[in-house]
Amino acid sequence: VEEMRYEPFAIHNWQLNPRMSLETSLVYEYSEIQQQGDFNQTRDFTFFKPKFDYRFDVTPQIQLRMLVEKSVRQINFVDFVAVTDTSDEDSNTLAGNNNLRPDYWWNYNFNAEYRLPDDIGVVSANIYKHHHKDFRQRIDVSTGDQLASAVGNIGSGDMWVLDVRTSTRMKFISLPNLLVTTRTSVRTSEVNDPFLGIDRSFDNFERGRFEFGFRHDIPSWRMNYGLNFNNRFDGNLTRYDIEDLETDVGDPFVTAFVEVFALNNTSFRFDVRNLSDGVQCRERYRYQGHIRDQILEEYEKRCNGSGRVLTFRVSGTF
């Protein structure tokens, strides 16, 4: 497989007034994909990719941004040909798709940022939607009685995301050197499944996650310490295929550290990864024949964990 691609573009920045700006751009993408081997063909693809990026400083503390942009996802050449699946003991080969097309989407994005008084932190919220066309998921490419699936274009799909972040210094409780950060992300998506004919989430699409962290500097002791907590919302992290279905679930992931400077500015740092000793699990449902027949043949559950990882580091100039 060989691809030749050209992307001429034009960009213009508009300063509408001291508080408003608008960036516009237009990219023209032309690509030619040539396939040779068991299957020979040459195909051309053209895309216009406009972008409108509007920014408005409502006040020195409040900023708004609105973005509309068209993006194109490039094809993975591996998806054109059959490949060996070393991770599946029951299926040796993943089929390819000679007629695969690039998929594209429109991104509608709104972001608001508020800088807290007395420079103690920032709160931001980002909400956006992606409207996909020629969306790529696995499709049925069976021949005769031999079941097979490959990556293919299945039509339209939509995704919505709300992402809220905070970063705050705890001045109001007399701890100006304590920085607390949070992030909450809520996500949903919808596409029509080519195997079951149902509306479902995108493959490997998580529902969201919650993150919390802090770092406390104590200059008088020449010390700092911190912790980060990351928890993915379980559910919907699923992969659909022609004869099986897989879901992933996992425990929160926690890291912590403490660092001290001594002996001519030498750093002594102790880190702990996976402090909660969490595990990640995969559940797999293997069906006899096509998944639409819902004849369960095998259920498999695998869990693994790395255990806690402790690290002690000494660094400095000697």
Q: Would you name each region that the model predicts?
A:
Residues 8-14, 52-56, 110-114, 162-168, ...:
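Residues on the lipid-exposed face of transmembrane beta-strands in outer-membrane beta-barrel proteins
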Residues 17-21, 57-61, 105, 116-119, ...:
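Outer-membrane beta-barrel channels and translocator barrels
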Residues 233-236, 258-318:
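C-terminal beta-signal and adjacent terminal beta-strands/loops
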Residues 24-30, 54, 66-70, 112, ...:
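Transmembrane beta-barrel strands of outer-membrane/channel proteins
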Residues 1-4, 72-131, 142-169, 205-206, ...:
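Outer-membrane beta-barrel signature, preferentially recognizing the C-terminal barrel domain
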Residues 3-38, 45-55, 175-186, 226-232:
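Surface-exposed extracellular loop regions of Gram-negative outer-membrane beta-barrel proteins
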Residues 1-23, 43, 55-56, 68, ...:
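Outer-membrane beta-barrel transmembrane domain signature of Gram-negative proteins
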Residues 122, 127-132, 150-239:
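Gram-negative outer-membrane beta-barrel transporters
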